[in-house]
Amino acid sequence: KNILDSSSLDDNRIIIDYYETSPKSSLDFSNNENDITWIQILSGRIDTYYPNTYIPGRRVDDTKIIFIKGTHHVSLDTPKGSSFIVTRIPNYKIHENDANDMYESDLRVVNWGNEPVLKSEHDDRKRVYLLSDSLVGTDSVKGELIVYPQSTSCPEHYHMGAEHYQFITSGSVFAVLDGEEKELNKFDLLYNFENEKHWFYTKDDQCKFVEFFVPGENKTIWTQTTNVCTWSPIGTDIRGKSPSRHIEKHVHGEGKNI
């Protein structure tokens, strides 16, 4: 099921499809030379195979993202059924900060489940980076998992130089865009255009959502300068284990070596 394409946007920077498979299903994906694609598992597990390469197949669960850059073919098996979203950025080089004329080829699994958890200094929200220049070798996209406990909010802000979307993976949250309020529930998608003021809050339910920025490099502007989103590492990954790396405390959008 297609859930976002150029018919909904001002351009074709993001294409998103949702898949739900039955047990023992197989799917094949081909990526073009000038595109990047990532596959995020929402439920179940996927066995991956990479025909005509020396890359070994592996089992992927909902703490990992399959990232494809350039010309590649990927085969997916879902032994017990699965749901996942496939996001593609056509001609990703136009979104890179310092792009060259070379289209790289890369295929990797990002184990974001072992990435460091960051906590907001002003409330109990948590953040985990899913895609970044350090993780996937391009700054054309940046992805994050955001966790909102009950009765939590973020300050109003907007972004210059990028558009982004939120996809709700569990729970519910209220989004306020330019003063208009909308409740979002599991598997809802919200798209934020550049310079569109927005903020979020929860009531009696907690919420988890992923958000992806295109381009990944952009500037966040806070409509009020108090309590801006500052994030500090808590020393564990999302499973409570030691993380794979350290990320320094930073204001959202201003971190280095993310």
For the regions a language model picked out, list residue spans one by one:
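A short, N-terminal "cap"/entry segment at the start of jelly-roll beta-barrel domains
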Residues: 1-15, 22-29, 57-62, 81-83, ...
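Short, solvent-exposed loop/turn positions at domain surfaces
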Residues: 15, 28, 35, 53-54, ...
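Short, conserved beta-strand element in jelly-roll/cupin
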Residues: 20-21, 31-48, 145-149, 158-175, ...
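Extended, compositionally biased flexible segments
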Residues: 28, 33-64, 75-76
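Short acidic-glycine-tyrosine-enriched beta hairpin
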Residues: 38, 52-71, 179-196
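A short hydrophobic beta-strand segment most commonly corresponding to one strand
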Residues: 65, 80-96, 191, 205-223
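Asparagine-centered strand-capping/turn motif at beta-strand->loop junctions
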Residues: 74-79, 200-203
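Compact recognition or signaling/catalytic modules
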Residues: 165, 171, 176-187, 197-202, ...
